[in-house]
UniProtKB/Swiss-Prot annotation:
Its main location: cytoplasm. It is found in: Cytoplasm. HAMAP family: Dephospho_CoA_kinase (MF_00376). Keywords: ATP-binding, Coenzyme A biosynthesis, Cytoplasm, Kinase, Nucleotide-binding, Transferase. PROSITE patterns: DPCK. Pfam families: CoaE (PF01121). CDD domains: DPCK. One of its GO terms (molecular function) is ATP binding. This is Dephospho-CoA kinase. The keyword Transcription does not apply.
């Protein structure tokens, strides 16, 4: 059971997953909000609520969520994005906390892409530390176009739909700057791991 929980966040295409993987190599359990969000949106009451609000156009023929269609809708419209978050986020938060507390390890990391947007510690009071992966906006843009095949316009919308770098940095206890050098991420993870282990067992 992990009583010490670190929230890991950063903008889209910032390298959160790469940093999380470095912590996993060190034996730290990582709970991924994106994975939990997909589980929450499987057929059931949350998906029913999504379909009731957005219509059947966000469903595939087999009744599962058409993630691409929904993503396009919510990135294009702030009100629709907020509506989706109101439907899904309470369930995601509950499951994240449950999974983090149940994790076996020296401490647990919970990767939460929209931590700043959700209100930081005010919304996640059970986080002991907040770790932000920071990346220049130009590099985010480039990664989205290369990694996800996003157009320049969609990449712009995806970045501006999220909190600003300044807002994310304002909630950070620790910051890792990711310029795409894996060795630097690995070194940062080892340094922070030693600190978090000490904090988890004072």
């Amino acid at each position: 059971m992990s009583d010490f929980i670190v929230g890991l966040t950063g903008g889209i295409a910032s390298g959160k997953s790469a940093l999380a993987a470095e912590f996993e190599k060190l034996g730290v359990p990582v709970i991924d909000a994106d994975v939990i969000a997909r589980q929450v949106a499987e057929p059931g009451p949350i998906l029913d609520a999504i379909a009731a609000y957005f219509g059947d156009s966000v469903l595939l023929p087999d009744g599962t969520l058409n993630r691409q269609a929904l993503r396009y809708r919510v990135f294009a419209d702030t009100a629709q994005r907020q509506a989706l978050e109101a439907i899904t986020h309470p369930a995601i938060r509950r499951e994240l906390q449950r999974a983090a507390l149940a994790a076996q390890g020296p401490y647990a990391i919970v990767a939460i892409p929209l931590l700043a947007e959700a209100g930081g510690r005010a919304t996640y009071p059970w986080l002991d530390r907040i770790l932000v992966v920071d990346v220049p906006v130009a590099l985010q843009h480039e990664r989205l176009m290369q990694r996800d095949g996003a157009t320049a316009e969609l990449a712009d919308r995806m970045i501006t739909a999220q909190a600003t770098r300044e807002k994310r940095l304002a909630i950070a206890d620790e910051v890792v700057c990711n310029h795409g050098v894996l060795k630097q991420l690995s070194q940062a993870a080892r340094r922070l791991d030693a600190d978090y282990r000490a904090r988890a067992n004072p």
